[in-house]
A protein has these predicted regions:
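Signature of N-terminal electron-transfer/Fe-S-associated modules in redox systems
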Residues: 1-164
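Extended, polar/acidic
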Residues: 156-378, 500, 504, 550-583, ...
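Short glycine-rich loop/turn motifs
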Residues: 1, 44-45, 190-191, 227-228, ...
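Short acidic, glycine/serine/threonine-rich loops at helix termini
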Residues: 108-112, 143, 151-152, 252-255, ...
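Glycine-centered tight turns that cap/initiate beta-strands
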Residues: 70, 211-220, 389, 455, ...
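Terminal domain-initiation and capping elements
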Residues: 159-172, 262-289, 293-317, 323-324, ...
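C-terminal catalytic domains of large/alpha subunits in multi-subunit enzymes
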Residues: 123, 384-391, 419-425, 476-580, ...
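Intrinsic disorder at enzyme termini
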Residues: 9, 127, 131-181, 554, ...
Length: 893
């Protein structure tokens, strides 16, 4: 046993296992789950602790190495009080999902102590803070607020108590008290692991689980693929075991006997389209997974090619002819090019995780999910259980970004193993699994053509997209161009190209960033050919009223207005500015919200989940405004499927669904409270007094339809898309309970970049973003989320490079040491402007922003690189080798 001091108290490990890591001792033996395991490689900093006054990562630290030493975790920073850094993080909303927050807080507290001792009264600069926190990553992208919080804490501005911060759960996140699915520990809980295929394409010929059941500590084993089944990608689930600990579970997996009949495999977009390529789905039935958020319609197949789907084209045949004729005559105003985007891993810091527990025929699942209400129904259907017997809980969710919307392997394994073992089972993916088999933003090839007339009008547009989502289909990329730019003829065609790779998944604006990267560069090229300002051309071609206002706003911003003065187009380091625009649909669900008075206090509840967006605080703020109270006066209960039916966190529908429902509930409750208080309290008494004097009452309201908008003629963008658009709109409402609202969100962004022409490095030095999403319900949290979306877009444009073994399809960048996401030093200061008009027909006046905020980032950066260096990069990420090769050729690459 190893003895050491833990948060000021003596502690001793349970055994002398030489392979035992400090993080395992803290989480599994001491129950201090504030210290998080993310990368397991010392890269992300989430597991940071203080050992004898210095910070260290506990995921690499042998437990024996701390013998006789002092270890402080986030729980022990300030005892029952809050450390100044924790207060600063609360005040500045220096977090989103909160999974990485304890590590940041511990590191920042160490910086605070050394800074205050050496330089009291001074404020550290952004570069000094970035250097100190360089070993920490935040996938949500809360870096700007983190820098502000650390700077003010080190300057001594948080030495005393503070008022409540903007985020209700902030104190739990900065102290490590917030409980995520991976932190759940039931009495007698077992650990589950999944055995995965080592073949990219094979027939499963044998599967024997009996040897695993003979391994000491193994309590259950299940098959996840049947003998004779087709194995279609490396990492596909084969079987799973549950054991008393992870070590026993690993031995159980190793004992399972598996037989394969290897079959020819095809890896990637180009190989799958090659003549004679092995077929992923050779039979007439094509059991392909859905990589999109919408329903799948019957679509023709030709070997590995699914499509075309061109239902949202507008005079597509005319567009095709106009562009073909322009090519034939070599029209100088024709812009045409092929663009490539690579897959992007979601990289949520809390992995896919499920803990299942049966009680008779009732099932409780703690699940890291973006859809607790939906998942409760899906689990009931999948396992043949009544919906009233299933409860899904997600108190906190450590990120998702689209990857946690459906039932996946961890849920199936946990539920089946728990039933087989007769005990609770947790299945939590390790980082390699999380970044290999849980989905990714599909890559694509886009062929784009724009034809302008002699007077500068847009005559025709063509977008053909070939999506690369592995064994999955249903990507929509080209279709979104129907809602961008007013061309009388548009040929918009989507294809899916299947190959033996894990299925892709929705990721923040599915299809949108890919289209924007290609289309917005083509618009810039058209402006160059027409010799007009790129912003002015967009203003002419784009009739959307929301974006029209944003173009006018952007024209006045120094980053755009003064770009000729700030540009540097010679020498090694060059600077340029690029612009891009985007749109996204406005969606909402017919959800319910319960508003209640209990014990003289007002509370709101619904079965929604918070993965960092701050929906708790949005609900509290909305209720507080309706009743003239403060946000902290409102109780909020979410994260439980037994509450009023809530929305999925996807497609930017959450706030747009819940706020109108809550306002409807507020109107009902006000009427009821007035009626009950009549004769007891004056008619003009403030709501605070009426609520305090009221008996307990609870009522629910459903999200009402929007009022007709005169601007949009009462129609959604899909309903304006002809017969097919109206049909798609109906299918969404009928089968997915998803309504497409009137109008769409808009974005107009400008990026300034510096290009190192010697080393090929590109960095973003300034970023200015304009968003049109109607009334912003919680400005502090909205700004934080928008900035994080932009930072994910910067990663997509410059750094994130998912590499595969060309023979097997195994992901070679399945760790944060190999797959680079932006760190705090990679991100610029970001200025965000919200145009809050245009959605007065929506109760509450606003819609969602999580998707739209990511869409135009990569395009704006690519356009800025062209402005700075004179070369156009048609492939992302914009790696140094690609940039240098383009500079050497002096042409697009």
């Amino acid at each position: 046993m190893t003895a050491f001091t833990l948060n000021g108290q003596p502690f001793q490990t349970a055994d002398d296992d030489p392979e035992l890591l400090l993080i395992d001792v803290l989480r599994l033996q001491a129950g201090l789950t504030g210290t998080k395991l993310v990368c397991g490689a010392g890269i992300c900093g989430a597991c940071t602790v203080i050992i004898d006054g210095k910070t260290a990562v506990s995921c690499l630290m042998p437990a024996g190495a701390v013998a006789g030493r002092s270890v402080i975790t986030v729980e022990g920073l300030a005892g029952d009080d809050l450390h100044p850094v924790q207060r600063a993080f609360i005040a500045h909303d220096a977090m989103q999902c909160g999974f990485c927050t304890p590590g940041f807080v511990v590191e920042a507290a160490s910086l605070y102590e050394s800074w205050r001792a050496a330089r009291p009264g001074e404020t550290p600069g952004r570069e000094e803070i970035a250097a100190a926190l360089s070993g920490h990553l935040c996938r949500c992208g809360a870096y700007g607020n983190i820098c502000e919080a650390v700077a003010e804490a080190c300057a001594g501005k948080f030495e005393g108590p503070i008022a409540a911060g903007p985020r209700l759960e902030a104190a739990d996140k900065v102290t490590g008290a917030a409980k995520y699915t991976v932190d759940i520990a039931h009495e007698g809980q077992l650990e589950g692991l999944i055995l995965r295929s080592t073949q990219p394409h094979a027939r499963l010929t044998a599967l024997d689980l009996e040897p695993a059941l003979r391994v000491p500590g193994v309590k259950a084993a299940i098959a996840m693929s049947a003998v004779g089944a087709a194995i279609r990608y490396y990492g596909q689930e084969i079987a799973a075991v549950a054991a008393v600990d992870l070590a026993s579970a690993k031995r159980g997996l190793a004992a399972i006997e598996v037989g394969y009949e290897p079959l020819p495999a095809v890896i990637g977009l180009d190989a799958a389209r090659a003549p004679g390529a092995p077929q992923v789905y050779p039979g007439w039935r094509k059991p392909a997974a859905n990589s999109g958020e919408g329903p799948m319609f019957p679509t023709p197949w030709k070997r590995n090619l699914r499509g075309p789907t061109g239902a949202l084209s507008l005079n597509g045949g005319k567009a095709k002819k106009l562009i073909a004729d322009a090519r034939g005559r070599r029209d100088p105003l024709l812009v045409a090019g092929t663009f490539r985007t690579e897959a992007q891993s979601h990289t949520a810091f809390e992995p896919h995780a499920a803990t299942a527990r049966w009680s008779g025929d009732s099932l409780t699942v703690h699940l890291s999910t973006q859809a607790i209400a939906h998942m409760a129904k899906a689990i009931a259907k999948r396992f043949g259980v009544g919906e009233d017997k299933v409860r899904v809980i997600a108190e906190h969710v450590g990120g998702g970004f689209g990857a946690k919307l459906s039932i996946t392997g961890e849920t199936v394994a946990a539920v089946e193993l728990a039933r087989a073992a007769g005990a609770p089972v947790r299945v939590a993916f390790d980082r390699h699994e999380e970044m290999s088999v849980t989905g990714y933003r599909p890559g694509a090839e886009l062929q784009v053509a724009l034809l302008a007339g002699q007077e500068g009008e847009l005559q025709a547009m063509s977008v053909k997209a070939y999506a690369d989502a592995g064994v999955a289909v249903n990507s929509s990329i080209a279709a979104f161009a129907r809602m961008m730019y007013d061309a009388p003829a548009k040929e918009l065609v989507d294809y899916d190209v299947v190959s033996h790779l894990p299925p892709g998944a929705p990721f923040r604006g599915p299809g949108g960033p890919l289209l924007s990267f290609a289309l917005e560069q083509a618009v810039d090229e058209a402006a160059e050919k027409l010799r007009v300002d790129p912003l002015a051309l967009r203003l002419r071609w784009d009739g959307n009223l929301e974006r029209q206002r944003l173009y006018g706003w952007m024209a006045k911003q120094p980053i755009w207005r003064d770009r000729a003065v700030t540009a540097v187009r010679s020498g090694r380091f060059r600077r340029g500015v690029g612009i891009a625009a985007a749109n996204w649909l406005y969606w909402w669900q017919g959800v319910e919200v319960e508003l209640a008075v209990r014990g003289g206090k007002l509370s709101v509840s619904t079965s929604v989940q918070d993965m960092g967006t701050g929906i708790r605080s949005v609900l509290a703020r909305t209720a507080a405004e309706a009743f003239g109270l403060e946000q902290e006066d409102i109780g909020v209960e979410i994260g439980d499927s037994t509450l009023a039916p809530g929305p999925i966190s996807g497609g930017s529908r959450t706030t747009a669904s819940l706020v109108p429902a809550l306002l409807a509930a507020a109107d009902k409750l006000k009427a009821e409270l007035r009626e009950r208080s009549r004769g007891r309290i004056g008619d003009n008494a403030p709501w605070r007094e009426i609520i305090a004097a009221s008996d307990d009452i609870a009522l629910r309201a459903t999200r009402p339809p929007d009022a007709p908008s005169a601007v949009h003629r009462g129609l959604s963008p899909l309903q304006e898309g002809g017969f097919i658009g109206k049909t798609f709109d109906w299918v969404l409402r009928r089968f997915m309970h998803l309504n497409t609202g009137q109008g769409s969100s808009g974005a107009v962004y400008a990026a300034e970049v510096e290009v190192d022409t010697l080393l090929g490095h590109c960095r973003v030095t300034r970023y200015v973003a304009g968003l049109a999403v109607g009334r912003v319900q919680h400005p502090v949290l909205a700004r934080n989320q928008a900035a994080g979306s932009i930072i994910q877009g910067i990663g997509y444009a410059l750094y994130e490079n998912r590499q595969l073994d060309p023979a097997t399809g195994a992901v070679l960048t399945a760790g944060l040491e190999d797959y680079r996401i932006p760190g705090i030093a990679d991100t610029p200061e970001i200025d965000i402007y919200f145009d809050e008009a245009g959605f007065e027909h929506v109760a509450g006046g606003g819609i969602g922003l999580g998707e739209i905020a990511t869409l135009p980032v990569a395009a704006s950066i690519a356009n800025a690189v062209h402005d700075a260096a004179g070369v156009r990069l048609r492939e992302i990420p914009i790696r140094p080798d690609r940039l240098i090769n383009a500079l050497r050729r002096g042409e697009a690459a």
